[in-house]
């Protein structure tokens, strides 16, 4: 990889979402460096056409070395812990990794050639809200994971005012599904992602699914979420980076389809695709909110983006297909 070329660093590039972003960057003939400590990333998700560096964003000296040696001009920053329940019980771990890790990255950018950064944020920073959410809504993080994303956003905005680079903050809604290529998908099982769990259960003789809370202030009592296909989300990062390069204007955008599905609705769709599933209702999880879905007007206007996979049945089917491949 020539040092004179402008290269893109993807932190967390061996993870679920990161690997899909890397896949599309490589498809676009970009020079990509993946930084991942493989704590929540996986070797099998590392794209062989990218340069992989096993490192931790908490290791500031290593980040300096990577950005200098590979002449990084743009960063897509995904490296973070993201288990909502774990965050409530281990705040120090999440503070050090998600907040201090982001701070390290920003401080290293001061004396570098980095021009743009895309940050992986979360719709959870809005807190417990009703209906469609636009980007102007005041942040009100309810759980500690959401708080780490909010604080990281604030660090990026503050740093950008004092330095030359531009930023794109992407507030993800619920990411699901797997790449149409069939080469990558979600491996981690511990995050409690509904569609991932259903895909796992689809391969069992007697599938079971836990629903955390059926007493929320929603139509059927279960949480409502805006599910977005991971390959569509990856495409948003590509278009977001292009926008920063072409327009030199920072942005904050919601990343969803603008349509909410309840947990029960997702389970019912799964039943139609596959088979019956034993539903087991549990207590609410700490940090979970009742309903959240995106207002996508600004999102589509700025990036001129149109989804390719915005079909919930297709999303679930792609997750099941990936799960079958993992098992085999």
Report the location of each language-model feature:
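Short, flexible, glycine-rich and Lys/Arg-enriched loop motifs at helix boundaries
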Residues: 43, 173-194, 206-225
């Amino acid at each position: 990889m020539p040092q004179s070329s402008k290269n893109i660093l993807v932190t967390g590039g061996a993870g679920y979402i990161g690997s899909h972003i890397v896949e599309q960057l490589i498809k676009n003939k970009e020079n990509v460096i993946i930084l991942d400590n493989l704590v929540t990333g996986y070797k099998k998700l590392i794209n062989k056409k990218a340069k992989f560096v096993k490192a931790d964003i908490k290791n500031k000296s290593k980040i300096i070395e990577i950005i200098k040696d590979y002449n990084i001009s743009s960063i897509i920053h995904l490296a973070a812990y993201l288990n909502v329940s774990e965050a409530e019980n281990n705040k120090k771990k999440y503070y050090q990794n998600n907040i201090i890790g982001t701070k390290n990255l920003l401080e290293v950018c001061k004396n570098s050639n980095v021009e743009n950064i895309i940050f992986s944020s979360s719709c959870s920073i809005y807190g417990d809200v009703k209906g469609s959410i636009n980007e102007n809504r005041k942040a009100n993080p309810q759980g500690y994971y959401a708080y780490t994303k909010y604080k990281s956003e604030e660090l990026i905005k503050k740093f950008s005012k004092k330095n030359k680079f531009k930023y794109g903050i992407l507030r993800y809604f619920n990411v699901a599904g797997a790449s149409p290529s069939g080469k990558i998908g979600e491996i981690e099982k511990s995050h409690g992602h509904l569609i991932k769990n259903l895909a796992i259960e689809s391969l069992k003789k007697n599938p079971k699914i836990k629903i955390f809370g059926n007493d929320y202030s929603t139509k059927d009592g279960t949480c409502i979420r805006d599910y977005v296909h991971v390959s569509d989300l990856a495409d948003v990062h590509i278009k977001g980076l292009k926008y920063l390069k072409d327009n030199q204007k920072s942005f904050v955008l919601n990343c969803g389809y603008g349509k909410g599905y309840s947990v029960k609705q997702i389970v019912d769709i799964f039943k139609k695709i596959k088979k019956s599933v034993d539903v087991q209702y549990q207590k609410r999880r700490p940090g979970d909110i009742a309903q959240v879905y995106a207002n996508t007007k600004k999102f589509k206007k700025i990036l001129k983006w149109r989804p390719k996979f915005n079909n919930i049945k297709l999303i679930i089917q792609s997750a099941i297909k990936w799960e079958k491949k993992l098992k085999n």
